[in-house]
Regions:
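Helix-loop module immediately N-terminal to the HCX5R catalytic loop
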Residues: 99-132
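Short, acidic/polar
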Residues: 65-72, 199
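Short, polar loop motifs at secondary-structure junctions
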Residues: 44-47, 64-66, 82-89
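Short loop/helix-cap segments at secondary-structure boundaries that form the rim of catalytic
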Residues: 72, 87-96
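PTP/DSP superfamily signal
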Residues: 1-47, 119-131, 146-228
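Glycine-rich nucleophile elbow surrounding the catalytic serine of serine-hydrolase chemistry
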Residues: 140-145
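Beta-strand cores of modular interaction/reader domains in eukaryotic scaffold and signaling proteins
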Residues: 52-53, 59-61, 76-84, 97-102, ...
């Protein structure tokens, strides 16, 4: 089954890519960590499988992964969120729930306008205890940005915390600067709505007062370590 969103995904008049000095410095920190992780990725080998971000639920990968029915069935993936320009073959669309939001991997693309939709979609799949693959062409920019937005929204984490978590799971992620800037501004929105705290080291007491049912990434990881 295919759900196709054809809304034009480009920067609108209200979306500015002009960075403040603070935004520029914060992006430099993320890019430095990303470069270190990318070096390890090339030095120690690559994997032919999608990256498991959260246990038994969320996978991040590329177009090749999304086109491999045997691989998808092995990982019990039922849902595919495709955010690249290319569609999937009919064989995949007939056997999986495919949601296609085509968008170019360009800094001026307004990817943030889709965060509410993709976050709700992924959270719905999580609640059904089913598995989803989020992918773009290479699994490093568009799809990584979508996953980062989900981690920020539903695990109450700052961009820095979510980014450091994700590069441990998939070191080759490389969102373009425009996407990183939009994630920073999305973080500001979540801070204003008290869904995340402004300080990476701040107590999570205020967050725990919220209605959001999913733990922070640290709580999530700790719980699963105890279950093993």
């Amino acid at each position: 089954m295919l759900t196709l969103y054809t809304q034009k995904t480009v920067t609108d008049d209200d979306h500015s890519l002009i960075m403040t000095d603070e935004e520029c410095e914060r992006i430099k920190i993320l890019e430095h960590e990303r470069s270190l992780a990318f070096d390890k990725y090339y030095r120690f080998g690559r994997t032919a499988e999608p990256s498991l971000v959260l246990d038994d639920f969320l996978f991040l990968g590329n177009l090749q992964h999304a086109s491999n029915r045997v691989l998808l069935e092995r990982f019990k993936i039922k849902h595919i969120l495709n955010v690249c320009d290319l569609g999937l073959e009919q064989n995949i669309m007939n056997n999986f729930n495919v949601i296609h939001i085509p968008m170019p991997d360009e800094p001026q693309t307004n990817i943030k306008k889709h965060f509410d939709r993709t976050n709700e979609l992924l959270h719905g799949i999580y609640e059904k205890k089913e598995c989803c693959l989020v992918h773009c062409a290479a699994g490093i920019s568009r799809s990584a940005t979508i996953v980062l937005a989900y981690l920020m929204k539903y695990h109450h984490n700052t961009l820095k915390e979510a980014f450091f978590f994700l590069i441990e799971k998939r070191p080759q992620i490389w969102p373009n600067e425009g996407f990183l800037l939009q994630l920073l501004r999305y973080e500001t929105e979540l801070i204003r709505s008290r869904e995340i705290t402004a300080n990476d080291n701040e107590s999570t007491e205020a967050i725990q007062m919220q209605e959001n049912p999913i733990e922070t990434l640290n709580e999530f990881e700790h719980k699963h370590e105890k279950d093993e």
